[in-house]
Amino acid sequence: MSGQEDWESEIDNPPACVPNLSNSEPAFKASNQNYFSSNNAFNRTTERGFGNRKASDDCNQNFEFSERGFGKQRAGSDANQNFESSERGFGNRRGKGRGGFGTFGKDSNGKQESGDFTNDDNRTIDDNRRRGGFQRRGGFNDETSGRGRRGVRGGTSFSGFGREDGNEQSGFTSNDGFNNETSGFGSGRRGSRGDSSFSGDRESDRGRGFGRGGFRGRNEDIGVESGKGQEGFERSEQGPRVTYIPPPPPAEESDIFKHYQTGINFDKYDDIVVEVSGSDVPPAILTFEEANLCDSLAKNVCKSGYVKLTPIQKHSIPIIVAGRDLMACAQTGSGKTAAFLLPILAHLMVKGVESSAFQTLKEPEAIIVAPTRELINQIYLDARKFSYGTCVRPVVIYGGTQMFHSLKQISEGCNILCATPGRLLDVIRKEKIGLTKLRYLVLDEADRMLDMGFREDIENLLKSSGMPSKEERQTLMFSATFPSSIQSLAREILKPDYLFVVVGQVGGACSDVEQMVIEVDEFGKKDKLMEILQEIGSERTMVFVKTKKKADFIATFLCQEKVPSTSIHGDREQKERETALRDFRTGQCPVIVATSVAARGLDIENVSYVINFDIPDDIDEYVHRIGRTGRCGNTGRAISFFDKRGDDEQRIARSLVKVLSDAHQEVPAWLEEVAFSAHGSSAYNPRSNKFASTDDRKRGDSRGDYSTSGFSPSAAQAEEEDWG
């Protein structure tokens, strides 16, 4: 055809003359590096580039680098192509790369295309796997969806605004963020350090924290093992970085020492039976004067409204002052926090503190660990109250808050460190605190930490560098329940001659709580809850449910029914959790719906009712839940919904009957029938094997001379009754 272009002929017969570009210079020359190497080597590292990668191994390709050039392509045969890429330029990539704003590249098999529409092995471009990026030497097309075709001189750089994976995905970079193998914008091997910083949609490529990369080069590490950068930002694996800074604690003295009055039943504590087992037991004290507190501490105790010692305080304070390890078990709301804080503070104030704000490495003398953020913050407020106006500085750190804030608090001086296990291990790994001067290690709610997911954290804490051995430190463990299995674990932490204090009925519910069990099926619980709340009115009520989703659902349902409510559970952000507790404490929301996160140790003023919307399958959890009311001699009521067909109800039935009987509460006849039918079934977990009523060392394991104080044989016999 004369005068017309023969496209078929041009495609089948490539031009005989190929321009020689070997003498071309790059756009920006920033180093003396040889741009045209002939040794067919692959340079696998880039520094701060916009995504330079090696070519596919299918052909003998040669990548050459300039430090700041834009890079360009050299001419050559299909089987031996040479590429230049820039270490700081708009990187050149191989087929499966995830690099920069593409200049001349390759297709997914490492073969260069020789025409607009076909490559050398005569496959159409639509058959190739496509990536997003600036392609065809300037056009922007998403090849994944088949839009656009590659240009004559190479393919795309497989990045820019796109993702790899062979399907269309969005995002500015292809590998989930700005950083990958060599940081810069995009680029890098999958699985390299700091896999993703500003994560996109792909779960498999998500990294933790800022990682290595982001806005820095390969060797400029700003990430740490637990996903928290040195700048103090925490990042979850799927969420944004944590920037929440909790509000400062109250500064006014009247707010610091604000307290609620003890109830009319507080004097009944004098009648509670106490057992202390072990050798050489220090005698109990009866008044605060006998504790020999320094003047400043004694004044703060008085300002806090403490007039009379509780049973756990009478026995624990002299034991701790004597330097003995202690495992103390007392019912909820009986003053366990003051029982370990007062002797620790008294010792630090008399002997003097060693940690100073002027030291680079802060070394606290006491570390207090609790399983929940709310509980550890409460312990801190008590420590701050008792140490007010003294040389002792308590600090609290916990997850869900900005790491930088935690480190800042520590840097200002730290004598008593209150922490949750995870955040404590983080600051130890960062070497922000030292442990060589540690005198006291306190585990509050110790049974939960050893038995419910925190055991590994506690073991890692005890193995931390600088941690004194158990012979060199004083270890104190407190809880409302100490099952036998936990006692066996605790003996690995405590000295062999530790003392065991039992107050009242171990694992039993507080006698100041009126307990009621109501038979109701699953579908009638909401109506029954509304009926009870309408009768209660504006009295402060905690509603416990089993799942996080149900907590939000019930709270929303109550709000729709014009009952001001809020919720608290582990999936809520720390700011939301603290706001919920504040609204509940102030009475803005008289009803709070919670999971077990709020069942441990929280001391909220004037909680009149606890409602178990979902009864727990573990009797320990039941005891802790109802212990949110009836505290410090105040009376309270606990109402539990019981669905006889529920699995959890079957598991707890017989243990629940015993708890009710021990607390002199009425046991419904139908509940006794359920408990009897559950006897011997797989759903029944015998309470006698779960609860420890006395020191396990007394059960045939005689490793010392054990004495008892205030011990009632008849009471112990009842507690040890075998329900199995």
Curated annotation (Swiss-Prot):
Region (Disordered): 1-25, 37-241, 683-724
Top-rank taxon, per record: Eukaryota
Keywords, alphabetical: ATP-binding, Cytoplasm, Developmental protein, Differentiation, Helicase, Hydrolase, Meiosis, Nucleotide-binding, Oogenesis, Repeat, RNA-mediated gene silencing, Spermatogenesis
Domain Helicase ATP-binding positions: 317-500
EC number: 3.6.4.13
Residue ranges, compositional bias (Basic and acidic residues): 108-130, 693-704
GO cellular component: pi-body; piP-body
Chief location bin: cytoplasm
Enzyme class: hydrolase
CDD domains from the UniProt entry: DEADc_DDX4, SF2_C_DEAD
Domain Helicase C-terminal: 512-675
Acidic residues composition bias: residue spans: 1-11
Catalytic reaction(s) noted: ATP + H2O = ADP + phosphate + H(+)
One of the record's GO molecular function terms: ATP hydrolysis activity
Similarity field: Belongs to the DEAD box helicase family. DDX4/VASA subfamily.
Free-text function comment from the UniProt entry: Probable ATP-dependent RNA helicase required during spermatogenesis to repress transposable elements and preventing their mobilization, which is essential for the germline integrity. Acts via the piRNA metabolic process, which mediates the repression of transposable elements during meiosis by forming complexes composed of piRNAs and Piwi proteins and governs the methylation and subsequent repression of transposons. Involved in the secondary piRNAs metabolic process, the production of piRNAs in fetal male germ cells through a ping-pong amplification cycle.
Protein name in UniProt: Probable ATP-dependent RNA helicase DDX4
Organism: Pelophylax lessonae (Pool frog)
Organism classification: Eukaryota, Metazoa, Chordata, Craniata, Vertebrata
